[in-house]
Amino acid sequence: MAKNTAIGIDLGTTYSCVGVFQHGKVEIIANDQGNRTTPSYVAFTDTERLIGDAAKNQVALNPQNTVFDAKRLIGRKFGDAVVQSDMKHWPFQVVNDGDKPKVQVNYKGESRSFFPEEISSMVLTKMKEIAEAYLGHPVTNAVITVPAYFNDSQRQATKDAGVIAGLNVLRIINEPTAAAIAYGLDRTGKGERNVLIFDLGGGTFDVSILTIDDGIFEVKATAGDTHLGGEDFDNRLVSHFVEEFKRKHKKDISQNKRAVRRLRTACERAKRTLSSSTQASLEIDSLFEGIDFYTSITRARFEELCSDLFRGTLEPVEKALRDAKMDKAQIHDLVLVGGSTRIPKVQKLLQDFFNGRDLNKSINPDEAVAYGAAVQAAILMGDKSENVQDLLLLDVAPLSLGLETAGGVMTALIKRNSTIPTKQTQTFTTYSDNQPGVLIQVYEGERAMTRDNNLLGRFELSGIPPAPRGVPQIEVTFDIDANGILNVTATDKSTGKANKITITNDKGRLSKEEIERMVQEAERYKAEDEVQRDRVAAKNALESYAFNMKSAVEDEGLKGKLSEADKKKVLDKCQEVISWLDSNTLADKEEFVHKREELERVCSPIISGLYQGAGAPGAGGFGAQAPKGASGSGPTIEEVD
């Protein structure tokens, strides 16, 4: 396989997944724990940084410094209502840095703060490493997916996270579109089909309607909620049980981060159980002040707790149908994507909405997005496999884009659901006589007045020659690239003077310098992680050597071949090292290596003398090279004859 392989990464709110297209098919790659999805968690401890399963597994012990949900922060402002409401549920601290949210944690004994892009970049680095371990060579090219309903700043911030992780982001593509590729790739030649992708994940919800016809995937409309998913169902369960605990035990656990985290983990498990059983039990020992919490919940009660959220998933479905100008009967396939679509009630609501139509569950809801991203990555790298070479993706802009005209009116140049890439030009003029310049303010959203929409950026076109109002002609061009990221240019026709802006949300966007700095920091963290790995390996090697020596001299088979004095010398030294290890677990690699050499100086002559004297190599399971047998990194095992 050529070294210029590109990977597809589904960077999820709660879990991420990576795939690669090679030899004509997609492989979803398992991580070092054998899991095909990896938690989007990053944990900081006194000694190290953990990413993925390792981070999620220790979350109850370290809730304040374990960061997740970075996708719910990325590209948003600190003052956003959703950020403020999420902060109530998060055990980690979110601080305000010039209206940008930053996550504050304790790492190696000092307080550190990170932008959401940095946290996401750590997860991306992990996914990149998972792919590299599988492929056996470095990987830099990647396609990363985002919810279709992500706005410009969220897309741009996700792209920045990729850059910080050392990736060359070939393209940002929409999750439902990627899932549609996974669905439609093997279904060519069936004529034109209208497909509705219903994608309900851990933190985001998208609905997209596509027409798939012989390798052409054309998105007709998209709708969704970038803040609805499995986490919100977990939150409802957590609140329910916090109240139940209050009723039963007259105690409020909501301020105890560790108790709430243990409860949340149990709720997540119960929620999954309720997709296949009608009842789930929670058993948490010593949840709070020594009180054991044993309780249960029925599926009906869970559905009742989340009923408004579940019903709310149908609004975007209706909106997408309206925008695509289709009615229910015109949809051929209803495809479920995202782990939360396993919830029976969600399936039933969708099925009833489409008058009892069967839902298509043929693709893996956890892996479909990464699968499609991997296919798109291969196409962008020029893969010539027959099943992808004719594939064409036509995606859309999720929100209308325009600028503010006199009186604060929103004038849209690009309507929502326009196929991208696209370019629209319109001519504007001045509002007052001899106006020397115009302020171009770019907004996204569907409301009539700009104050109700989202300001993406603003720039000035100055130096307009004096003229009566309405005479100067200013040509404004909106150009959206294939990533859904916008460039705006304004030109004064009389002077040819132009000014342009890549909408990079001056307020929300990281500057080039910041990104550079973060790239270097990411490298540094990676180096620190490696030092930590080497340190642990040296510690394990010392520990296993000490125990091996101890068991070697205690071996019954050596009675009479080893003087008591020598035996005592080895045992005392081993015991000394083992005690030293217990009280110096955080020593440097060099100290472990030094201790080991010290131990070898005592043991080697005795052990090798023993085997030469005994003339019986291999006695007690050690070859003549016994001391070196344990010198690999990490614990080693000896074979016993």
Curated annotation (Swiss-Prot):
Residues 618-641 are annotated as: Disordered. The modification Phosphoserine is found at S604, S631, S633. Residues 2-386 are annotated as: Nucleotide-binding domain (NBD). Component of the CatSper complex. Identified in a IGF2BP1-dependent mRNP granule complex containing untranslated mRNAs. Interacts with CHCHD3, DNAJC7, IRAK1BP1, PPP5C and TSC2. Interacts with TERT; the interaction occurs in the absence of the RNA component, TERC, and dissociates once the TERT complex has formed. Interacts with METTL21A. Interacts with DNAAF2. Interacts with TRIM5 (via B30.2/SPRY domain). Interacts with PRKN. Interacts with FOXP3. Interacts with NOD2; the interaction enhances NOD2 stability. Interacts with DNAJC9 (via J domain). This is Heat shock 70 kDa protein 1A. The modification Phosphothreonine is found at T636. Belongs to the heat shock protein 70 family. It is found in: Cytoplasm; Nucleus; Cytoplasm, Cytoskeleton, Microtubule organizing center, Centrosome; Secreted. The gene is Hspa1a. The modification N6,N6-dimethyllysine is found at K561. GO terms for cellular component: centrosome; cytoplasm; extracellular region; mitochondrion; nuclear speck; nucleus; perinuclear region of cytoplasm. The N-terminal nucleotide binding domain (NBD) (also known as the ATPase domain) is responsible for binding and hydrolyzing ATP. The C-terminal substrate-binding domain (SBD) (also known as peptide-binding domain) binds to the client/substrate proteins. The two domains are allosterically coupled so that, when ATP is bound to the NBD, the SBD binds relatively weakly to clients. When ADP is bound in the NBD, a conformational change enhances the affinity of the SBD for client proteins. CDD domains: ASKHA_NBD_HSP70_HSPA1. Residues 394-509 are annotated as: Substrate-binding domain (SBD). GO terms for molecular function: ATP binding; ATP-dependent protein folding chaperone; protein folding chaperone; transcription corepressor activity.
